[in-house]
Every structure is written in structure tokens, then in C-alpha cells.
Amino acid sequence: MSLRTTQTIHGSYLMPSPGHASVADAMHPGIITCDAEATLTEVARTMATHHVHSVAVLSLARGSGPSEEAEIWGIVSDLDLISAGIRGGPERPAADLAHQPPLIVEPTLPLREAGELMVAHGAPHALVVEPATNRPVGMLSTLDIVGILAWGEA
């Protein structure tokens, strides 16, 4: 693996080259979520508060028992909010704005393959899911990939 030391405001770290990077090297760990009923205004405030460009939209998966487990069934991006805001409707729910189903990638997937999938699906964001647990572990954006392209060795 070819690595390059990159200086940042917070110190330095090793950046993999684009040809050797995986989704885990570029993704943002953790995800910001909203309920399917959240309004455009509420989703916009969540994005602004957390300085993110997308949120995962949750719905409740109701099983046969008393327990309920939230599942991610879509992604709303900042461009979705702008588009909906221009057409009016600040009270529209996130469920109406979400891209469904979300593009899902694994952390070990080569970054080039993830980028190809994102381009093919027209998805600026992909949900990163750990296959062993089927749990979301992060979000990958096109800007995350650009960061590797910009700072990793060619």
C-alpha cells in the first residue's frame, strides 16, 4: 500500500493512495439520522447543526413482538432540501424527499468500486454497512472520495 503523510490543522495522518483505498479509509464514521416524519425545516436544521450534507431517514420496522427497531430506508441530501425548498413546502416530510432505497456499500469495498457504484446510481452518498452485523457504521460521500483523490498518492 502506498501512503502519503498529509499535514492538517490537527496534525498529520497517513492517506492511502486512491488505487489502494477502501471505503473505510474515506467514510465518515457514524451517521446522522432523522425520522421519516421530520419536516424539511427540521432536516435542514439537523444538517446545519451537525455540518453534514446528508441524513439517513429512519422508519420503524415493526416485528411480531413488542420491540421496535429503527431501520434506515432512505437518504436525504442537501440538494434534495434545496430542490424541495425552491418548490415550496417547508413542512414536507423527509419520507417524501428521501432517495429510496439507499445505496449500501461495505467498509472493505475498494474505494474505486464504491465510486463507480455511486456514479452508476447517481447517488452522492452511500450508507456504509458492516456485513457481519448488518448495522450502519458510516456514510460515504462523493466529497470523501475527492479527498482521497486530492491527497492520496496517484
Give each language-model segment a name.
Residues 1-154:
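Tandem CBS (Cystathionine beta-synthase) repeat/Bateman regulatory domains
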